[in-house]
Structure formats: structure tokens, C-alpha cells
Amino acid sequence: MKTMDLQELEKRFQEKIDKEIKIEPNDWMPDEYRKTLIRQISQHAHSEIVGMLPEGNWITRAPNLRRKAVLLAKVQDEAGHGLYLYSSVETLGADREATIDDLHSGKAKYSSIFNYPAVTWADIGTIGWLVDGAAIMNQVALCRCSYGPYARGMVKICKEESFHQRQGYESLVTLCN
């Protein structure tokens, strides 16, 4: 590829970004943009999957059937978020298995908040209310990110995270009564 051709592609790419036109999987994109998206989205996917673990441990110990059903739905949602995000990474040419292998080997990262134990039911409510609440604050902006599949996925994910936050808050209010 000639240098002028590359410069023209970069110019067109930047024009799309400047006009807030979403970049789609088949569009040309700079290698650094692609690499950054793969790293960011895979880290997000890993965080969704690892984030299920503390709550998943509480499904059989939830205080009542309603709380168990809500927690089961939440864990299922988080798994879906992770799978959706792994699919978004695949649209960038990354291999899902290699991405997961990077997580298992420690090469890839995830949100460190999930390294803390959830030893009481109040911890589960707090994860829902505060951790998911913080995630919403960070993720709402991603609904407007430049990469189309990620932006569209984030709209769905943020709606579900809002449900998780409400359930966490309700769980803690119930404990306080």
C-alpha cells in the first residue's frame, strides 16, 4: 500500500470519527485503534465474567426464593454481557479462545474489585448497588463510543446494569429494616 493511500484511509477514518459516524467491523481502521479496542473490550468482557463469580457463589445461599431468582437472573445477565463483548472482540479479528487464554494466563486484566470476597449477603447487595452503580457511571459514555458493535452492546448492558443496581439497593434496604 502506498503511503498516500494509507494517509487517505487515515484521513477518511478521522473524518468519520469527527462526524461521530460509527466505525463498523468491515470499515478500515488503524491497527492501533483495533488493538486498543481489542484490549479494552476483552478486559471489559473478562470483568463481566469474573464479576459473576462472587455472586454465583451465593445463589444457593440467598436468603429466600425471590432473592435467589433475582441473583440467578443477574448472574445470567452478566454471563450474557461477557459473551456479547467477546463477540464484539471477534468482530475486530481477535480469537475468542486466545482472548480467554490471555485471561487465564494473567496476561489480560479484569476489574480488581472482584478480587475481594463477598462473605455476607450484605456484600452481594453492596456489589449490586455500588459496584454496578459505578460501572454504569463508567459505561454510559461507552454507549456513544466510536465502534458500532461496542456502542450498541453497551446500550443493552447499561439498561441491565441499572436493574442490577436497583436490586442491590433494594436488598440492602431490606436488610436495614
Language-model-derived ranges and their functions:
Residues 1-29:
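Extreme N-terminal leader/anchor segments
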Residues 112-167:
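Internal, conserved structured core segments that host functional sites
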Residues 33-44, 62-81, 124, 149-161:
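Alpha-helical scaffold segments that form or flank carboxylate-/histidine-based iron centers
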Residues 2-13, 69, 74-102, 168-176:
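Conserved alpha-helical segments that form or flank metal/cofactor-binding pockets of metalloenzymes
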Residues 22-42, 102-128, 145:
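Acidic/His metal-coordination segments adjacent to aromatic residues that form catalytic metal sites
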Residues 27-33, 51-73, 134-151:
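Helix-loop segments that flank and shape redox-cofactor active sites
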